[in-house]
Amino acid sequence: MKIEAVIFDWAGTTVDYGCFAPLEVFMEIFHKRGVGITAEEARKPMGLLKIDHVRALTEMPRIANEWNRIFGKLPTETDIQEMYEEFEEILFAILPRYASPIHGVKEVIASLRERGIKIGSTTGYTREMMDIVAKEAALQGYKPDFLVTPDDVPAGRPYPWMCYKNAMELGVYPMNHMIKIGDTVSDMKEGRNAGMWTVGVILGSSELGLSEEEVENMDPAELREKIEVVRNRFVENGAHFTIETMQELESVMERIEKQELIIS
């Protein structure tokens, strides 16, 4: 079996180490309404279409109960739409600052292309958001062959449609000749639902939720413990493989190709 294409996520996988761009904005739009949410809560639905992310936050029991305590009712679809509009406005202003390729990504992409492998991508950002991110990332040397957003298909993650559209546009089939790599639980589900080899990357991921500085300064034993928690979470949600950095991706590909592994 030969791997013919790799489909990458964006924030937390190829750009925006730690996936910090949306995090503070999610927390801010709830805080403005007197409902405090933690970074851990804000990260949990990461990878979903952003309005679905806001909706998922309002459905968390603790957050819903706090909202009910303050407003005397549960969040409505109108509340969700209003918060999402605020989220978009704030995020658009800061996105250019969070589009730098993560260390090592450009080198891995170049190596894959030398092997004739096509590069696709999926995201939880809208097309309008990605117009900003993709343009800035391209200026800094990262440009996949194809990009699909949830706006381009009937539904975003965990549905497989973005991966299928990549496959069609890149001209690659069957799906087990492709790898999906991402940094969230929804990425793992997307890849598995699409019938692809699915890989979770840990350092720089939203699931780990640490900045480069925090990783560098953390006690090695504590960091190792956090890495293993994320690794287990990826595996529990369908990852065939986990890697700590993007530089390990090609060794995963070689395992798939040389051992003639079968997707299960």
From Swiss-Prot:
Binding site for Mg(2+): D9, A11, D183
Top enzyme class: hydrolase
Catalytic activity: phosphonoacetaldehyde + H2O = acetaldehyde + phosphate + H(+)
InterPro entries, A to Z: HAD-like_hydrolase_sf, HAD-like_sf, HAD-SF_hydro_IA, HAD_sf, PGP-like_dom2, Phosphonoacetald_hydro
Residue numbers annotated as active site: D9, K50
EC number assigned by the record: 3.11.1.1
One Gene Ontology cellular component annotation held by this UniProt entry: cytosol
Cofactor note: Binds 1 Mg(2+) ion per subunit.
Alphabetical GO biological process terms: DNA repair; organic phosphonate catabolic process
One Pfam family linked to the record: Hydrolase
Keywords for this protein: Hydrolase, Magnesium, Metal-binding, Schiff base
GO molecular function: magnesium ion binding; phosphoglycolate phosphatase activity; phosphonoacetaldehyde hydrolase activity
Cofactor section: Mg(2+)
NCBIfam families linked to this entry: HAD-SF-IA-v1, HAD-SF-IA-v3, phosphonatase
Function: Involved in phosphonate degradation.
HAMAP family: PhnX
Family: Belongs to the HAD-like hydrolase superfamily. PhnX family.
Record note on quaternary structure: Homodimer.
Name the UniProt record assigns to this protein: Phosphonoacetaldehyde hydrolase
Organism: Bacillus cereus (strain ZK / E33L)
Gene of this entry: phnX
